[in-house]
Amino acid sequence: MPRRKQSHPQPVKCEGVKVDTEDSFDEGPGALVLESDLLLGQDLEFEEEEEEDEGDGHNDQLMGFERDSEGDSQGARPGLPYGLSDDESGGGRALSAESEVEEPARGPGEARGERPGPACQLCGGPTGEGPCCGAGGPGGGPPLPPRLLYSCRLCAFVSHYSSHLKRHMQTHSGEKPFRCGRCPYASAQLVNLTRHTRTHTGEKPYRCPHCPFACSSLGNLRRHQRTHTGPPTPPCPTCGFRCCAPRPTRPPSPTEQEGTMPRRSEDALILPDLSLHVPPGGASFLPDCGQLRGEGESLCGTGSEPLPELLFPWTCRGCGQELEEGEGSRLGAAMCGRCMRGEAGGVATGGPQGPGDKGFACSLCPFATHYPNHLARHMKTHSGEKPFRCARCPYASAHLDNLKRHQRVHTGEKPYKCPLCPYACGNLANLKRHGRIHSGDKPFRCSLCNYSCNQSMNLKRHMLRHTGEKPFRCATCAYTTGHWDNYKRHQKVHGHGGAGGPGLSAPEGWAPPHSPPSVLSTRGPAALGATGSRALHSDSP
């Protein structure tokens, strides 16, 4: 067979081996196995002259090759009208320069140059603007299959997502893989750990649009916003209880409709698991609920006349937090700065003689709040429980915030600075009290005389003059006084230090260790000896 010559012989790369067409090009070009990476989307031209001897008289031919994988060389690929194979088959046809290759039909999006959308999970076709396979379409057709529901076998939890069910199952197994790096806190969900870390960083990203309230949890913000929106629920016909959030109210029982309440025995009284110290006459400060008042009178009994309200512990009536010196400028309704700002923004608060529209009220004092955790924290002022203790001194408090503020006494940190003078302190309440020196404001006024002052401690000390109480007694002589400063000054007469001992000073928040129990008077509310004595004995930390 005569050899075929080319005017411009070119080397063709075959299976990674370079073959010269002039020496070894014995077969037609269709028998070559060309590399796919060389021929992707490319056309190879073979320019041939007329053969000298007999042969085919074709001049120029254009041959096209489509991209094919290594393992799919036999048979036709789906979507292509012709097969790709080296074997002759009756179903194929010869390709020439004049023949046109039929292209598969394109969608309307591909004709405009757009990429096809995701495939339908039911029929596998491309999804468009409308339903792809007629399922659930406006023109009828079979309805879409229902979405899968993943349900818990241990409770009524149901979800559309399996990941939610796996996360929920950790609540039953007790697994808590997410742990805090600063404290022993652990949780089964990452979102809870993220919310917990804000307690260490102090971040409060959720802010109320109606008042300066800010918090670190979206749930707390939604609960707070219920104080701005919506009227309170109707009061209870028996005790006047109200709720801030609309809740289904229990229909009154037949005995309540008749106006008679069943009398319970003393053994059936439901009391909180707290060691309550109820002063004589304390029942006069209970809310106007007959049931609570009856229980309070059974606890308190009958005694002397009630003491003035100012002798009660200075706690915020909005959140239950114990107030420091300089806080609570409103007499009879002492409030912390955050609750006062909330009240200025339109939050209604209950009066000192009843819970008002607040759902959780203390049965031993006029304290009322919207939140049950605030009431539980407030009850520690009555029980005398102080779980938070300082590691460097005997100081203890019922609130963690007070302990953090006290620790600045040991560290010497003073983050609060006066903008008008070089004064700096470690307590925001002290800075506010110092600011009254520049402004001359005296918000604390006596209700029995014209006395006014700029510190709540001075007003408490002044009220002892009206009651005649002198709680500070000398253990050496019969000297008594109502002022802690006078008591320390008197101890110098006996050669003792400022706290009653040689060279010692009283730590803040506790009585001198050598003083007998008679040093402090036991008259008045027990809460005065537990919480109010700290304000009478020494300045706040």
From Swiss-Prot:
GO terms for cellular component: nucleus. It is found in: Nucleus. Residues 44-55 have a biased composition (Acidic residues). The modification Phosphoserine is found at residues 85, 96. GO terms for biological process: retina development in camera-type eye. SMART domains: ZnF_C2H2 (SM00355). Widely expressed. In the eye, expression is greatest in the retina and least in the lens and cornea. The keyword Hydrolase does not apply. A zinc finger (C2H2-type) spans 150-172, 178-200, 206-228, 360-382, 388-410, 416-438, 444-466, 472-494. Keywords: DNA-binding, Metal-binding, Nucleus, Phosphoprotein, Repeat, Transcription, Transcription regulation, Zinc, Zinc-finger. Its main location: nucleus. Binds DNA. Can associate with the proximal promoter regions of PAX6 and SP4, and their known targets including ARR3, RHO, OPN1MW2 and OPN1SW. PANTHER family: ZINC FINGER PROTEIN (PTHR24403), ZINC FINGER PROTEIN 845-LIKE (PTHR24403:SF109). Belongs to the krueppel C2H2-type zinc-finger protein family. Transcriptional regulator that plays a role in retinal development and maintenance. This is Zinc finger protein 513.
